[in-house]
């Protein structure tokens, strides 16, 4: 009898501790509007070359592109650098990604070894690539899959 009581209690407590990703910021809660905003930003910036520290159409880095996209399209203020951006919001599982979530990669060592983009849809994200400038990439790409570090919901 005691065994069954313990088993039922354990199952009940396990059910109470289910993992749920946090809800997105109210400005990012309408996935259709977020996708439209991201597509508009990508269309405007597509092909803009990568430039470390850049924040203009003549050159932009990954954290600058993320900062400007969130500010200009969703009225959200983010820190300027990738390391600090990687600490805001709540870490979420890759399987829980929604449009507007930030995706982070460890592509090298030190501060310059971090990369950030914004999850779009269908396992795609937009970002400023060091080799190809502002573009859309797939999280299924071997390079991005291998270097994926974390995802955050703001």
What are these regions (language model features)?
Residues 142-154:
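Glycine- and charge-enriched low-complexity intrinsically disordered segments
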Residues 57-70:
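Active-site nucleophilic cysteine motif
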Residues 25-29, 49-57, 106:
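Second-shell loop/turn segments in exported
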Residues 10-34:
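Bacterial Sec signal peptide processing site at the extreme N-terminus
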Residues 38, 42-60:
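Extracytoplasmic/periplasm-facing segments of secreted or lipoprotein envelope proteins
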Residues 26-28, 76-135:
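...with weaker cross-activation on analogous glycine-rich loops/strands in unrelated enzymes
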Residues 42-50, 69-78, 107, 129, ...:
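Sec/Tat-exported extracytoplasmic proteins
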Residues 1-4:
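Positively charged n-region of N-terminal signal peptides that target proteins for export
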């Amino acid at each position: 009898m005691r065994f069954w009581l313990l088993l039922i209690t354990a199952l009940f407590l396990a059910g109470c501790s289910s993992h749920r990703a946090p809800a997105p910021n109210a400005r990012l809660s309408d996935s259709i509007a977020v996708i439209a905003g991201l597509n508009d930003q990508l269309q405007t910036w597509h092909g803009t070359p990568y430039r470390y520290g850049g924040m203009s159409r003549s050159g932009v880095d990954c954290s600058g592109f993320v900062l400007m996209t969130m500010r200009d399209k969703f009225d959200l203020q983010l820190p300027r650098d990738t390391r600090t951006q990687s600490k805001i919001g709540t870490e979420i599982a890759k399987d829980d990604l929604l449009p507007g979530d930030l995706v982070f990669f460890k592509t090298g060592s030190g501060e310059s070894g971090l990369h950030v983009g914004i999850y779009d849809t269908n396992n795609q994200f937009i970002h400023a690539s060091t080799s190809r400038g502002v573009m859309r990439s797939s999280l299924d790409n071997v390079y991005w899959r291998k270097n994926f570090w974390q995802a955050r919901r703001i």
